[in-house]
Amino acid sequence: MSFIPVEHIACSTAKLPSSRCPLLLLQPNGSSTKPVRWRSACNQCHAAKVRCSGERTGCDRCNNLQYQCVYAISRVGKVPGVRARGNKAVRTTTEALQRPATASTLPDADSTGEFQTDQRSENDPLSRSDFGEQDAAHDALSPKSHSALFPDWTEASDKSLNAYETADLFILPSQLMSSDQDPSRSRGHSLQAPSHSGHSIADSHTAAMPDGGLFCPFNKPTTPIPALPDLDLHIQDFHPMDVPVSPLDNGPPVKRRPYSDASCGHSGHSSKGYMSSTFPYSELLSQIGCQTDCGRQPHHYNYRSWTVLICNRIVEFLEHRIQGGVVALDVVMQTNKVTLGEISRILSKGAHKEGSNCAMLLLIAIDQIVTLFECGVKQGSPGDSDRASIGGRDLSALGDDLTGGNVLPNLRFGLFQINQDEQLALRSYLLQRELQRCLQVLTNLRDAIPLEPNPCTALEARVKKLCSAIADSH
């Protein structure tokens, strides 16, 4: 098999543009009295598995794509063996490189009729073996996409016909609520333990809060409270930022001045007067708020706003505990420790003195803590003889000598075993110590709540009554 160049067909006779590539026909070496049967589809259309128009002067697809339209010998009928086909393919490639193909021919009418009626060569698996390397080169040149087939038809705005782009599949639902004023978009937060190393303003601003973050005001539950999951948070979950906090030793807080700035909404001079000098990271928040609100109505999430969000989140956390029916004393004591630790951090910054909103929310949180203690002590009272547990664990399998209620099982120091009376006394001490912490918080909140009668008085009475009940029962 070899390339046999034939004469050009005049463009005027074929009525084709002069820019079209010449047609090549592949036929075997030597003369044969039997007429040659050609494929009904050119090699380009056959390799791309598309319908070929079948013009011997060049099919429509090759003319549109400026390809060289080549028709091969039809392999219908008796074919040579595997070894002969392999040798013939190598010889065909060598002769094609030595003898350039620059001419085309028009077959007679009889052979043309045979080409158009012959359809079996399209599905013949042996027909591509003779020209394996030729078809491989054509496959590399054949475009598969719509943009590559018709580059002039595509426009810059027609990027994709699919409305759901690949990147859109990974957009979280909270990101669809476009809110540039959301403080969660300007501060990074995660449910992992915070790293107290310093961060730059750029790093803090570009970090995005994941869905379900702690302080996102839009991530509020929409289902009824009993159906909400129990929030097992820790103290680090309440920190709104990872910036080190300095102690309250720089004098009284400075009152805020109204927002005013001619350029971008922020400057070094205005930042000093805008926020309190005792809250260094609140000034950072105001700077981020100015950067995100350039060109829009000023809306700042300052330190006071952040504090109210934190207090509201604490109240929500404790309400889930109450609605979830948490009565195990170990869980109640751990919840009290976590919550009071965060409340103490807020009080140390003096945030409850700047406005009554924060103080009232903290008072509600203390009331919820006392409610948890009352339910836990009532559930685990010594009079409940059929329940002997600590933290909700059944201790009936440990022995019949457990007459107390919510006691500490098998507590010892090395070989020294602590008896039941000592365990009850230890439990009483731990409960009273946690309640004394609530009394300390109420003492700090009393001056910040300008109400008469002060609601802290009634809550302190409840705490003292609960402490007396615990001491008398043990």
Curated annotation (Swiss-Prot):
Domain of life of the source: Eukaryota
| Bias (Polar residues) ranges | 90-105
Q: Which organism is it from?
A: Aspergillus oryzae (strain ATCC 42149 / RIB 40)
DNA-binding region in chain numbering: 42-69
Tell me the function of this protein. Transcription factor that specifically regulates the gene cluster that mediates the biosynthesis of aspirochlorine (or antibiotic A30641), an unusual halogenated spiro compound with distinctive antifungal properties due to selective inhibition of protein biosynthesis, and which is also active against bacteria, viruses, and murine tumor cells.
Lineage runs: Eukaryota, Fungi, Dikarya, Ascomycota, Pezizomycotina
Q: PROSITE patterns this protein is in?
A: ZN2_CY6_FUNGAL_1 (PS00463), ZN2_CY6_FUNGAL_2 (PS50048)
Give the Gene Ontology MF terms in alphabetical order. Answer: DNA-binding transcription factor activity, RNA polymerase II-specific; sequence-specific DNA binding; zinc ion binding
Basic and acidic residues bias spans:
117-138
Protein name listed in UniProt: C6 finger domain transcription factor aclZ
- Write out the ranges of the annotated region (Disordered): 85-148, 177-206
| Key words of the record | DNA-binding, Metal-binding, Nucleus, Transcription, Transcription regulation, Zinc
**Quick one: which gene encodes this?**
aclZ
